[in-house]
Amino acid sequence: MVYSYSEKKRIRKDFGKRPQVLDIPYLLSIQLDSFKKFTDQDPTGERGLEAAFRSVFPIKSFSGNSELQYVSYKLGEPVFDVKECQIRGVTYSAPLRVKLRMVLYDREAAAGTVKDIKEQEVYMGDIPLMTDNGTFVINGTERVIVSQLHRSPGVFFDHDRGKTHSSGKVLYNARIIPYRGSWLDFEFDPKDALFVRIDRRRKLPATIILRALEYSTQEILDLFFERVEFKIKKDTLVMTLVPERLRGETASYDIKDAEGSVLVEAGRRITARHIRQLEKTNTTELEVPVEYIVGKYAAQDYIDPDTGEVLVSANSEISLEDLAKLSLAGIKELSTLYINELDHGAYISDTLRIDPTTNRLEALVEIYRMMRPGEPPTKDAAEALFQNLFFSEERYDLSKVGRMKFNRRLSIPDDEGSGVLSKEDIVAVMKNIIHIRNGFDEVDDIDHLGNRRIRSVGEMAENQFRVGLVRVERAVRERLSLGDLNELMPQDLINAKPISAAVKEFFGSSQLSQFMDQNNPLSEVTHKRRISALGPGGLTRERAGFEVRDVHPTHYGRLCPIETPEGPNIGLINSLASFARTNSYGFLETPYRKVVDGVITDDVEYLSAIEEGRYVIAQANIEVDSQGRMVEEQIACRHKGESTFMRASDIQYMDVSPQQIISVAASLIPFLEHDDANRALMGANMQRQAVPTLKSEKPLVGTGIERTLAVDSGVVVAAKRGGVIDYVDASRIVVKVNEDELRPGEAGIDIYNLTKYTRSNQNTCINQRPCCSVGEPVVRGDVLADGPSTDLGDLALGQNMRIAFMPWNGYNFEDSILISERVAQEDRFTTIHIQELSCIARDTKLGSEEITADIPNVGESALSKLDESGIVYIGAEVKGGDILVGKVTPKGETQLTPEEKLLRAIFGEKASDVKDSSLRVPNSVKGTIIDVQVFTRDGVEKDKRAIEIEEMHIAQARKDLGEEFKILEEGVLSRARNLLLSAGFTEAQIAALPRKDVLVQVIDDETKQTELEQLAEQHEELKADFDKKFEIKRRKITQGDDLAPGVLKIVKVYLAVKRTIQPGDKMAGRHGNKGVISKINPIEDMPYDEQGNPVDIVLNPLGVPSRMNIGQVLEVHLGAAAKGIGNKIAAMLEDQREKGLAEVRSYIKQVYELGDEVQQRVDIDSFTDDELLRLANNLKGGIPVATPAFDGAKEKEIKQMLELAGLPTSGQLKLFDGRTGNEFERPVTVGYMYMLKLNHLVDDKMHARSTGSYSLVTQQPLGGKAQFGGQRFGEMEVWALEAYGAAYTLQEMLTVKSDDVNGRTQMYKNIVDGNHQMQPGMPESFNVLLKEIRSLGINIELDQE
């Protein structure tokens, strides 16, 4: 493998055995691609904004004299960029402008004669835009729109599993689900009649809908039944025989063949053998006794040819009298319906009998009554209602997906078709459900991923936009019908408010628009790849049963079977598997390698769940020889959702990678294959809660996906193009781009500005640090700067800690964790948290609030950290209760006492008419002010601090743009100098030229002169561009802010809090092994090895066997080996000054070559000495290794690594007790494990209260830290005290410490008086109970004797 210069800095040794056929696709593409489809202009008009406009326009007036047509749309440029939107608290969006054409027709002239056409661009609201990282900035906060897994439109057949009826009979049903419009259900009742429901309303006999579709009884019977033909002879009937129809019946008469010999005697059951005999003898007619026809149903109406009287109506039961009538009327032939109990039920026939309607109008009226009960039906209204239900394109749409699913399920060959239903569609569904009831077909599995599809951002935004447009359409239609249209323009007809409101509501408050989880890069990526079955149009937690939540065979390679939340949402929220993507219909697909005649090819094809069922697919870990031919005889594979064994020649596809079935979070767990699934689930979920530490450290034992994840998440800065690093400082990196990657006429410079110390959604710190130096070559995709939780471009969520598995004096009982003081001293788990506190000055009824340092009744010391505007200085260290922003609020006028009047006369007005409402630091917080921002409403005078901040921002902008200009100018000038050199100027001449003269030299060579002139033009453009950019920036900084109504000023103060690790913090490994720190032990008391090195953390070995997450033990062993190898390299580097690099080179080479069939090839010999030295220095702390899930390091390889590191292959060491110096009685497993500090910090949870706020009705203390509440003393706690007979303790708990109002105030008094007695009274909750009983009308009074 070829490594770039920056990748050579640290290479992760990979134990993977399988060749990487396919790289993991870009992880955020599900979000970005979907939204791109929404905003991109689509000429076909099938999706996105274009589709929404085309579906609503043109809007015609009621009279038809005018219409509003849609021409095209364009999205403008956003006013602020993403960072500015976050700071100002506004939405990152672009204005949508639509070109509309208003056409007026001439009433007098012929139809369609145009009188006037007006075209105009109309503003239609703002559309939020997606940032490059797949998020939206809504009101200044980053949000993610989670994709939804919903039931695909189409037709589904199901049954009730025998739960509806007490008899346990299975009742089948069919449901046509459109993308939008009314649902149509067909269902059987226990008596086997077929019913229809529209939108889950009351049921009607199913034949009503057929009558409404203009089918007569005769046509209905012909659609659903075969006929049996009889010829009427004097006293017998001759039946046309179809032998197959007799199977399973009991013969009620002798069945004879053409010769008259008896084949089946009366009373015998007719079997397949008899039928074969009948077919052999070619018997086509059979004489049957007259009684045979009794009880059968006529297939058509029989009419007396003379009188026209109906003798036997269609679908009526035939009796002997009817037969006699027919004979009399001279009717010689009779058709009946072919019905048998087994597989040709009389369902439609029975349904027709209970159908009250006889013609189309009655059927329409019946449907109208069901849909609109209580309204008097008219013919037109009934027709219009039925037409609009399923046959109108405005009200009903199956969508492309729905039509495809519908046609495939009903075996209609074409995948395309109309979005509305046809008569044939409805009949086909009814035929199919009868087919299923007859036992010829199976019901569908609704949890199959072929029946559930993904709805992503773009599609949901389009739907919301369409909802807004439909609201506008109604208003436009009314306006077109009113008033004089000659004066009006399209602008006057359209009100953009409903559209903006619909879009805003979706992005701001939809259940699927979520506050982004920004704990660390992994949590961001997982949140964007999340697939939820909840939300509008989806399931609800309460209704979702076990089947929906369970892992389904079709999840393989599409949804992760491991990563899902614990708790009520389990199985309803899933994560996309690593390689999965959605196809054009919205179904999930996963890639497979094609296999031809037992040989694996490199062709990769994506298959959806529907397609996958047809093929035989082998797993990725099968054995193959060097030619890619399968070795084994029988190969484990999947076919039609079942696992089975097949021959190599039968296999058609094979998985692309063993990690294909799991999500990115799960594939970050090394040795996942050795962990129990429940613990792996916890491990995957807890990695998302890891807080970025002060100094990130790459995991020694990883899985090889860390780099992909860090780069795709967007928290690191990756090079857009190759080149050489030209300049680096803490906030900017400049890359001089390679000539061959430049576009013509472009300055060859890329500037990357870094994000410094900003706050994330979870209050953690986002900070980017450069990890490259000047002069280094870079290629596209190289990591230039690390973000939070990344280390040299690798995801680094925690720290590598030296761990011992042993008990230690009960301090690691029940998953507690004992850590060494050294961990705290070295700041290994120190994290920075940034809090944003805001102070808002409003305009109140009594006057406006004011931000000022002149606060009544506050001492000088409290104001020491404020400037003259009353705002805290940057860099001030503050603690709980300190004033951050001084603010005073006008107080209502009260009647003044004479003393107050005197004070007023002496001290002036100010002192009393305002009250202090300053912003103070919350109680438990202590930290440093790192930033202050002041937002002032337009027209309100800015204070001194606001002006200072503005000037600082302007100066910064000038400096940034100036430096950018300088760098770009230098790029242009250096190219001009090169040009002059090539044209014959000497270096001395060029050096002597002033900067401004370089571009105005005269060259004899004409082409070079033109080139120089082009460069001069480019320079002018740069200058103009700089002035323009600076002016825009300056205007943005100085303009007033758009604040909420009634708000004059907002001051935001950012407070950085440094949190060291302490007892009570929650930590975890990557295998679901979580625990709480119980004690921070002095270094000298920790167990140490024979070299005197103490361990960092002591874990309880009892946490491993019962939880079956053995992966952590293997990780510890491999971690020990990786660290040991690092120590050896460090020792060799110490010696290399004398011995040279040969030893280091051969040792590193040995390490990278270790292992069986390992795919990775690192050509250490091709490294220069400098490169090798840099690599070796980066490996000193331990060589990072990758052990991919299901394809990782084997036990043998771990032992080889331990040997290379010079450690015992058992992975166990002798340890000594730090307190006594005695050796522990047996060797202990010691090694390195990657530990994470989770965002459950004791500082955020610790809380105490003596007195505080009380609930209004019950008068009991509130609950929770946020309300400064008390601890709940519930019924179980009451039982505990009762069990001990602690009557007085119980009494005070239920009275004075809770809701005895008088008792608790009396307690104060008693304590002050030194009288430690309590007088419990009546608890308020008792009075509440009395009042509740009285509200029932029962007078209850307390007798206090």
Curated annotation (Swiss-Prot):
Which catalytic reaction applies to this protein? Answer: RNA(n) + a ribonucleoside 5'-triphosphate = RNA(n+1) + diphosphate
Q: Does the keyword Transcription apply?
A: yes
Q: Which SUPFAM superfamilies match?
A: beta and beta-prime subunits of DNA dependent RNA-polymerase (SSF64484)
A single Gene Ontology MF term assigned here is:
ribonucleoside binding
Q: What is its EC number?
A: 2.7.7.6
State the GO CC annotations. Answer: DNA-directed RNA polymerase complex
InterPro entries found in the cross-reference section = DNA-dir_RNA_pol_bsu_ext_1_sf (IPR042107), DNA-dir_RNA_pol_bsu_external_1 (IPR019462), DNA-dir_RNA_pol_su2 (IPR015712), DNA-dir_RNAP_su2_dom (IPR007120), DNA-dir_RNAP_su2_hyb_sf (IPR037033), RNA_pol_bsu_bac (IPR010243), RNA_pol_bsu_CS (IPR007121), RNA_pol_bsu_protrusion (IPR007644)
What keywords were assigned to this record?
Answer: DNA-directed RNA polymerase, Nucleotidyltransferase, Transcription, Transferase
The name of this protein is DNA-directed RNA polymerase subunit beta
Matches recorded under Pfam families: RNA_pol_Rpb2_1 (PF04563), RNA_pol_Rpb2_2 (PF04561), RNA_pol_Rpb2_3 (PF04565), RNA_pol_Rpb2_45 (PF10385), RNA_pol_Rpb2_6 (PF00562), RNA_pol_Rpb2_7 (PF04560)
Principal EC category: transferase
One GO term of the biological process aspect:
DNA-templated transcription
Alphabetical list of PROSITE patterns matching this protein: RNA_POL_BETA (PS01166)
Subunit structure and binding partners: The RNAP catalytic core consists of 2 alpha, 1 beta, 1 beta' and 1 omega subunit. When a sigma factor is associated with the core the holoenzyme is formed, which can initiate transcription.
Family listed: Belongs to the RNA polymerase beta chain family.
Question: According to its UniProt entry, what is the function of this protein?
Answer: DNA-dependent RNA polymerase catalyzes the transcription of DNA into RNA using the four ribonucleoside triphosphates as substrates.
Taken from the UniProt record, the cysteine pairs bridged by disulfide bonds within this chain are none
**Transmembrane domains' residue ranges:** none
Keyword Transcription in record? yes
